[in-house]
């Protein structure tokens, strides 16, 4: 009898403890929701200028169930201070972006909200990854984006689908270059203040079921002051290999900061080589612009194109691909005043891609 009473008391205490833990969890989630929500609302009101931007709010239970508690089976890719997962909510697939609370310092918290607000602003453009909603019930917001059936480009401008590398034909590579150029041009021209992305690279470009490229990651994007062509920042941010040398040495952000990064991006997807490649056993690295420029100066531009796709194009098409490589080199001129503007780049790429298809 005493044993039964003892077990009953233990059971009641255990149940009480579980209820208390559950209540504490609910209180913590509510606090995160209110804290994150107030910050986001303030930022969104400041940005949307009275326009309605429909964004869905997801619960933590939905996110955890969709990603198997952020399990490895749902992992897509990791980049910097965040991880991408595939998740299924109400029979629909989504890309779910989780920021690491251990890597996001107080200084970088603002970047998380920058990402939400600017992604929401770009949701109507077909070449940006569309923000569907978010969950505020974690220490940092978890973002839910449209699904990208064919994943994300890797550091060589390729893509892995179902565990196997897919060789992208040159026609698709040119299409990707053209449409990402259109997206960046939109950032530079569609708003009263020029918006500089600052993080253009293959690993921020997703591909949907129709192989349409979707630019993502606005965490370090910045507006230039209205009527101004540059802004000085406290620290340089971005990815080594894609950083504009002028920006890197002066901390001055201009529209040509994006032009340089785009030029590197274009070279990477055309050559199938990373932005920085090891050249010898001593650990030295050579920038892709230097690599491509060497071939250009020797009149051997066809030698830089990814050999896996060169045999599939005609001699007439090769001329247009080489024109694209030359354009990429112009984007990477060391003096930023010698670089073309994004609108000019977009126009030239449209023409190159059209001529390539007709050849």
UniProtKB/Swiss-Prot annotation:
Q: What is known of its domains?
A: The protein kinase domain is predicted to be catalytically inactive.
Designated gene of the protein:
ZRK2
Q: By what name is this protein known?
A: Non-functional pseudokinase ZRK2
According to the entry, every stretch annotated as the Protein kinase domain falls at: 64-356
What are the start and end residues of every segment in region (Disordered)? 1-20
- Tell me which InterPro entries the record gives: Kinase-like_dom_sf, Prot_kinase_dom, WAK-like
| Disulphide linkage map | none
Which UniProt key words apply to this protein? Answer: ATP-binding, Nucleotide-binding
UniProt: ATP binding residues: 70-78, 97
Q: Which GO terms describe its molecular function?
A: ATP binding; protein kinase activity
């Amino acid at each position: 009898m005493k044993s039964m009473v003892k077990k009953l008391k233990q059971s009641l205490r255990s149940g009480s403890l579980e209820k208390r833990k559950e209540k504490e969890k609910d209180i913590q989630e509510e606090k995160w929701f209110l804290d994150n929500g107030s910050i986001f609302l303030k930022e969104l009101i400041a940005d949307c200028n009275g326009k309605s931007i429909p964004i869905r709010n997801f619960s933590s239970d939905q996110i955890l169930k969709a990603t198997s508690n952020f399990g490895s089976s749902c992992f897509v890719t990791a980049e910097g201070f965040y991880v991408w997962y595939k998740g299924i909510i109400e029979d629909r697939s989504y890309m779910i972006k989780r920021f690491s609370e251990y890597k996001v310092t107080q200084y970088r918290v603002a970047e998380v909200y920058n990402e939400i607000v600017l992604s929401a602003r770009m949701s109507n453009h077909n070449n940006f990854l569309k923000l569907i909603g978010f969950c505020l019930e974690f220490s940092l917001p978890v973002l839910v984006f449209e699904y990208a059936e064919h994943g994300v480009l890797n550091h060589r401008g390729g893509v892995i689908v179902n565990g196997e590398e897919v060789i992208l034909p040159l026609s698709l590579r040119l299409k990707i270059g053209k449409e990402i150029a259109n997206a960046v041009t939109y950032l530079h021209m569609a708003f009263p203040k020029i918006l500089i992305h600052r993080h253009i690279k293959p690993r921020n470009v997703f591909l949907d079921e129709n192989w349409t490229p979707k630019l993502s990651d606005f965490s370090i994007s910045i507006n230039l002051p209205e009527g101004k062509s540059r802004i000085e920042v406290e620290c340089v941010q971005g990815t080594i290999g894609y950083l504009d040398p002028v920006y890197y040495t002066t901390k001055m952000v201009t529209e040509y900061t994006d032009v340089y990064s785009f030029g590197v991006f274009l070279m990477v997807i055309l050559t199938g080589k990373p932005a920085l490649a090891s050249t010898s056993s001593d650990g030295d690295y050579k920038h892709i612009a230097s690599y491509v420029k060497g071939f250009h100066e020797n009149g051997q531009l066809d030698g830089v194109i990814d050999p896996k796709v060169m045999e599939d194009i005609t001699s007439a098409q090769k001329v247009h691909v080489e024109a694209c490589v030359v354009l990429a080199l112009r984007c990477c001129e060391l003096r930023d005043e010698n670089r073309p503007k994004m609108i000019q780049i977009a126009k030239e790429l449209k023409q190159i891609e059209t001529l390539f298809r007709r050849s």
